[in-house]
Amino acid sequence: MCSTERLLFILKYGIAYVRFHKEINGKIEFIEQKHIMRYQQMFAALTVRNKIDEGINSGVIWHTQGSGKTALSYYLTYVLADYFSKQNKVAKFYFIVDRLDLLKQASEEFEARGLIVKTASSRAELMEQFRNNQAQEGNTGKPEITVVNIQRFAEDRSKVELPAYATNLQRVFIIDEAHRGYKPEGSFLANLLDADKNAMKIALTGTPLLKEERESWRVFGNYIHTYYYDKSILDGYTLKIIREDIETQYKERLSEIYEKLEILVEKKDVKKSQIVEHDNYVKELLRYIISDLKRFRQIQGDNTLGGMVICETSEQARKLFAYFDEIQAELNKDASMKSHLRAGLILHDSDDKDTRDKIIDDFKNNMTVDILIVFNMLLTGFDAPRLKRLYFGRKLKDHNLLQAITRVNRPYKENHYGYVIDF
């Protein structure tokens, strides 16, 4: 591990000063923290460099969720910029995501480490960057990375035309969450990657690629480097996850309410989804969730621990939020339950972006929101170490399930586990 070559590699590329805000004595302050490249990040970066020497310019890096793939991407910008400079080439980096919230999170992580982040809000803006044939868009002289939300261009299937290639420019595409629905032919991303045959293409994933997905991602080739769940847990970068069933009494009440509502549904022309949106069902669900999170905090002796509810429908999410304070007031009549939880609702069509960002920040950093109520948002890429209790109100499968449950696997204080409660 500590050979001279590796030690020099870490000293040259593997130290970052990360700026973030943290609550200190009741105040939010900005602090800088020195981060050292983790060993799996070092081996991945070394392997990428070795693959280029072998003439391989694409591949997949599978590092388990929560092990620092965005940080790895940051280190790669320095490693590869230096590598290509020795070949009289200037590297230009693109970080590709497929969600708006992931664009924001990745941008913040890169900026916290000192990278200048550029974004492209339209196809025209992105194409203008390509036409410039410049490694840097700004004039600061600091390292840059362009973060692109490919979802903006999902319906754009037109061919991407690039100007005559600048022989000293080396484009590097880093594609985040490589396991998700990418079609190797006909999409804007495929056309973009295909337009520059000389570009490096590094696909990141936190979950294994299934057989059909490996076929879909054949454009990236084989695994460059892997770092599995068991190693991440042993190394202390992620926590084990425990699945819990809901208490029998609540399970029986919810089943009884569901069965009664189901009978009503059969008599009327009503969608079954409306059962889980019914006031009676929602209120009983809230009684369990609020009581459970409060007891969990009492047992752990930590009132900073947070929760998240993944709802069956967006309407159910709205109702859970609407009835939250009412049900909490009812439960607070019991002295053992008399503490106050604050809920935040995160839906793509609820509130504006600034309001949603404020709610998320209040949960992650300010600790003025204790439980998030969601439907589709924040199930991937959301990194909040205090989140330790995840309530599944609906079924998720395959990668969506793996992505969601790993929201609770980040180390936090003295916690040894993240918990998933399955309804």
PLM regions: where:
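ATP-dependent helicase/translocase motor core
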Residues: 1-97, 101, 105-116, 141, ...
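Interdomain helical connector at the RecA1-RecA2 junction of SF1/SF2 helicase-like NTPases
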Residues: 214-304, 321
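Short basic/glycine-enriched coil/helix segment immediately N-terminal to the Walker B
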Residues: 53-57, 139-142, 158-171, 365-369, ...
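Conserved RecA-like P-loop NTPase helicase motor core
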Residues: 172-173, 179, 342-423
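Conserved helix-turn-beta segment of the N-terminal RecA-like "Helicase ATP-binding" lobe
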Residues: 101-125, 323-332
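Conserved C-terminal RecA-like helicase domain
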Residues: 141-144, 272-374
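SF2 helicase catalytic motif II
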Residues: 164-201
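Inter-Walker segment of RecA-like/P-loop motor cores
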Residues: 111-158
